[in-house]
Amino acid sequence: EIQISAIDKHGNQTTKPAKLNITRPERIAAPELGAQPTYVNGIMVVNKKHPLPVNYAPGENLTAGNAVRQIIADMQQAGFDISSSYSGYRSYSYQAQIYQQYVAAHGQAAADTFSAKPGYSEHQAGLAFDIRHGNGALVTNGPAAEWISANAHKYGFIVRYQSGKEHITGYSAEPWHLRYIGGQATAVHESGQTLEEYLGVPGGSY
Protein backbone atom coordinates (compact mmCIF):
# COMPACT_ATOMS: atom_id res chain seq x y z
CA GLU A 1 0.00 0.00 0.00
CA ILE A 2 1.23 3.51 -0.84
CA GLN A 3 0.11 7.07 -0.03
CA ILE A 4 -0.87 9.44 -2.83
CA SER A 5 -0.92 13.19 -2.14
CA ALA A 6 -2.49 15.92 -4.27
CA ILE A 7 -2.47 19.70 -3.89
CA ASP A 8 -5.12 21.88 -5.56
CA LYS A 9 -4.62 25.41 -6.87
CA HIS A 10 -5.59 26.88 -3.47
CA GLY A 11 -2.84 24.98 -1.66
CA ASN A 12 -5.11 22.41 -0.04
CA GLN A 13 -3.43 19.00 0.27
CA THR A 14 -5.22 15.65 0.37
CA THR A 15 -3.55 12.32 1.06
CA LYS A 16 -5.22 8.99 0.36
CA PRO A 17 -4.00 5.38 0.59
CA ALA A 18 -3.79 3.34 -2.60
CA LYS A 19 -2.80 -0.19 -3.54
CA LEU A 20 -0.33 -0.85 -6.34
CA ASN A 21 -0.54 -4.25 -8.03
CA ILE A 22 2.54 -5.33 -10.02
CA THR A 23 2.09 -8.17 -12.48
CA ARG A 24 5.24 -9.95 -13.61
CA PRO A 25 5.32 -11.61 -17.03
CA GLU A 26 5.26 -15.40 -16.97
CA ARG A 27 8.76 -16.83 -16.93
CA ILE A 28 9.74 -20.01 -18.69
CA ALA A 29 11.16 -22.54 -16.29
CA ALA A 30 14.80 -23.13 -17.16
CA PRO A 31 16.34 -26.60 -17.19
CA GLU A 32 18.63 -27.34 -14.27
CA LEU A 33 22.01 -25.67 -14.66
CA GLY A 34 23.72 -28.78 -13.39
CA ALA A 35 22.04 -31.07 -15.91
CA GLN A 36 24.15 -32.82 -18.51
CA PRO A 37 23.20 -33.79 -22.07
CA THR A 38 21.61 -37.22 -22.35
CA TYR A 39 23.40 -39.82 -24.46
CA VAL A 40 21.98 -43.21 -25.48
CA ASN A 41 24.14 -45.56 -27.57
CA GLY A 42 26.46 -42.65 -28.28
CA ILE A 43 23.69 -40.40 -29.63
CA MET A 44 22.71 -37.19 -27.86
CA VAL A 45 18.99 -37.06 -27.11
CA VAL A 46 17.32 -33.65 -27.00
CA ASN A 47 13.54 -33.50 -26.78
CA LYS A 48 10.76 -32.34 -24.45
CA LYS A 49 11.79 -34.94 -21.88
CA HIS A 50 15.55 -34.45 -22.20
CA PRO A 51 16.71 -30.81 -21.98
CA LEU A 52 20.16 -29.34 -22.30
CA PRO A 53 21.83 -27.23 -19.60
CA VAL A 54 21.22 -23.49 -19.87
CA ASN A 55 24.97 -22.89 -20.17
CA TYR A 56 25.52 -25.62 -22.78
CA ALA A 57 26.93 -23.65 -25.72
CA PRO A 58 29.09 -25.84 -28.01
CA GLY A 59 28.50 -23.86 -31.20
CA GLU A 60 28.04 -25.65 -34.50
CA ASN A 61 29.45 -29.17 -34.48
CA LEU A 62 32.27 -29.17 -37.03
CA THR A 63 31.54 -32.61 -38.49
CA ALA A 64 27.81 -31.94 -38.70
CA GLY A 65 28.41 -28.53 -40.25
CA ASN A 66 30.64 -29.98 -42.94
CA ALA A 67 28.04 -32.66 -43.64
CA VAL A 68 25.15 -30.21 -44.04
CA ARG A 69 27.20 -28.02 -46.36
CA GLN A 70 27.97 -31.11 -48.44
CA ILE A 71 24.32 -32.13 -48.70
CA ILE A 72 23.41 -28.58 -49.74
CA ALA A 73 26.18 -28.54 -52.37
CA ASP A 74 25.05 -31.90 -53.74
CA MET A 75 21.42 -30.77 -53.93
CA GLN A 76 22.46 -27.63 -55.78
CA GLN A 77 24.57 -29.75 -58.14
CA ALA A 78 21.51 -31.95 -58.74
CA GLY A 79 19.53 -28.90 -59.84
CA PHE A 80 17.59 -28.04 -56.70
CA ASP A 81 17.18 -24.38 -55.80
CA ILE A 82 18.58 -24.70 -52.28
CA SER A 83 20.05 -21.84 -50.29
CA SER A 84 23.63 -22.08 -49.09
CA SER A 85 22.40 -20.44 -45.88
CA TYR A 86 20.73 -22.56 -43.22
CA SER A 87 19.47 -22.25 -39.67
CA GLY A 88 21.91 -24.16 -37.48
CA TYR A 89 23.27 -23.56 -34.00
CA ARG A 90 21.21 -21.41 -31.64
CA SER A 91 22.16 -20.33 -28.15
CA TYR A 92 19.79 -20.78 -25.21
CA SER A 93 19.04 -17.05 -25.17
CA TYR A 94 18.38 -16.88 -28.91
CA GLN A 95 16.00 -19.84 -28.72
CA ALA A 96 14.21 -18.06 -25.87
CA GLN A 97 13.66 -15.03 -28.12
CA ILE A 98 12.30 -17.18 -30.95
CA TYR A 99 10.00 -19.14 -28.66
CA GLN A 100 8.59 -16.04 -26.97
CA GLN A 101 7.86 -14.48 -30.36
CA TYR A 102 5.90 -17.55 -31.44
CA VAL A 103 4.01 -17.66 -28.14
CA ALA A 104 3.08 -13.99 -28.50
CA ALA A 105 1.90 -14.54 -32.07
CA HIS A 106 0.18 -17.92 -31.78
CA GLY A 107 -0.31 -18.74 -28.10
CA GLN A 108 1.73 -21.25 -26.11
CA ALA A 109 -0.31 -24.36 -26.97
CA ALA A 110 0.16 -23.81 -30.71
CA ALA A 111 3.78 -22.67 -30.38
CA ASP A 112 4.69 -25.85 -28.50
CA THR A 113 3.75 -27.94 -31.54
CA PHE A 114 6.44 -26.38 -33.73
CA SER A 115 8.90 -24.48 -31.53
CA ALA A 116 11.01 -25.73 -28.64
CA LYS A 117 11.24 -23.98 -25.32
CA PRO A 118 14.76 -22.71 -24.60
CA GLY A 119 16.91 -25.57 -23.38
CA TYR A 120 14.87 -28.14 -25.28
CA SER A 121 15.98 -27.38 -28.84
CA GLU A 122 18.27 -29.62 -30.88
CA HIS A 123 19.65 -26.45 -32.44
CA GLN A 124 21.33 -25.64 -29.11
CA ALA A 125 23.26 -28.89 -29.46
CA GLY A 126 24.85 -27.66 -32.69
CA LEU A 127 23.65 -30.82 -34.45
CA ALA A 128 20.41 -29.65 -36.12
CA PHE A 129 19.94 -27.74 -39.36
CA ASP A 130 16.95 -26.29 -41.21
CA ILE A 131 17.26 -26.46 -45.00
CA ARG A 132 15.81 -23.63 -47.10
CA HIS A 133 14.96 -22.97 -50.72
CA GLY A 134 16.84 -20.26 -52.58
CA ASN A 135 14.07 -17.78 -51.73
CA GLY A 136 14.54 -18.43 -48.00
CA ALA A 137 11.42 -20.56 -47.53
CA LEU A 138 11.79 -23.79 -45.59
CA VAL A 139 11.75 -27.01 -47.63
CA THR A 140 8.30 -28.31 -46.74
CA ASN A 141 7.33 -30.61 -49.63
CA GLY A 142 7.90 -31.44 -53.28
CA PRO A 143 10.94 -32.97 -55.00
CA ALA A 144 13.49 -31.28 -52.71
CA ALA A 145 11.82 -32.64 -49.57
CA GLU A 146 11.58 -36.09 -51.16
CA TRP A 147 15.29 -36.02 -52.04
CA ILE A 148 16.19 -35.03 -48.48
CA SER A 149 14.02 -37.81 -47.05
CA ALA A 150 15.63 -40.42 -49.31
CA ASN A 151 19.25 -39.30 -49.10
CA ALA A 152 19.94 -37.43 -45.86
CA HIS A 153 20.98 -40.63 -44.06
CA LYS A 154 23.91 -41.04 -46.47
CA TYR A 155 25.39 -37.90 -44.93
CA GLY A 156 24.74 -38.93 -41.32
CA PHE A 157 21.40 -37.12 -40.97
CA ILE A 158 17.87 -38.14 -40.13
CA VAL A 159 14.69 -36.17 -40.82
CA ARG A 160 13.95 -35.71 -37.16
CA TYR A 161 10.23 -34.89 -37.07
CA GLN A 162 8.11 -37.18 -39.23
CA SER A 163 4.47 -37.03 -40.25
CA GLY A 164 2.30 -39.32 -38.13
CA LYS A 165 4.85 -39.38 -35.31
CA GLU A 166 3.87 -36.12 -33.63
CA HIS A 167 2.76 -37.85 -30.43
CA ILE A 168 6.22 -39.41 -30.11
CA THR A 169 8.49 -36.53 -31.12
CA GLY A 170 6.31 -33.80 -29.62
CA TYR A 171 6.43 -31.70 -32.80
CA SER A 172 4.61 -31.34 -36.10
CA ALA A 173 6.33 -32.83 -39.14
CA GLU A 174 9.35 -30.82 -40.33
CA PRO A 175 10.77 -32.17 -43.61
CA TRP A 176 13.41 -29.42 -43.53
CA HIS A 177 14.82 -30.21 -40.06
CA LEU A 178 17.88 -32.46 -40.21
CA ARG A 179 19.55 -33.92 -37.15
CA TYR A 180 23.10 -35.23 -37.40
CA ILE A 181 23.69 -38.57 -35.66
CA GLY A 182 26.55 -39.93 -37.78
CA GLY A 183 27.08 -43.60 -38.54
CA GLN A 184 23.74 -44.83 -37.19
CA ALA A 185 21.68 -42.61 -39.50
CA THR A 186 21.12 -45.28 -42.15
CA ALA A 187 19.91 -47.79 -39.58
CA VAL A 188 17.44 -45.26 -38.16
CA HIS A 189 16.29 -44.33 -41.67
CA GLU A 190 15.75 -47.94 -42.72
CA SER A 191 13.86 -48.72 -39.50
CA GLY A 192 11.25 -46.06 -40.26
CA GLN A 193 11.33 -45.11 -36.60
CA THR A 194 11.78 -41.83 -34.81
CA LEU A 195 14.94 -41.35 -32.80
CA GLU A 196 12.89 -41.91 -29.64
CA GLU A 197 11.59 -45.25 -30.91
CA TYR A 198 14.98 -46.37 -32.20
CA LEU A 199 16.75 -45.60 -28.93
CA GLY A 200 13.85 -46.58 -26.68
CA VAL A 201 13.65 -43.24 -24.87
CA PRO A 202 10.60 -41.21 -23.77
CA GLY A 203 9.31 -38.46 -26.01
CA GLY A 204 6.04 -36.60 -26.47
CA SER A 205 5.13 -33.50 -24.50
CA TYR A 206 6.94 -31.73 -21.66
Whereabouts are the PLM-identified features?
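Extracytoplasmic cell-surface/polysaccharide-interacting catalytic and binding patches
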Residues: 19-206
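Extracellular and select intracellular beta-sandwich modules with Ser/Thr-enriched
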Residues: 13-18
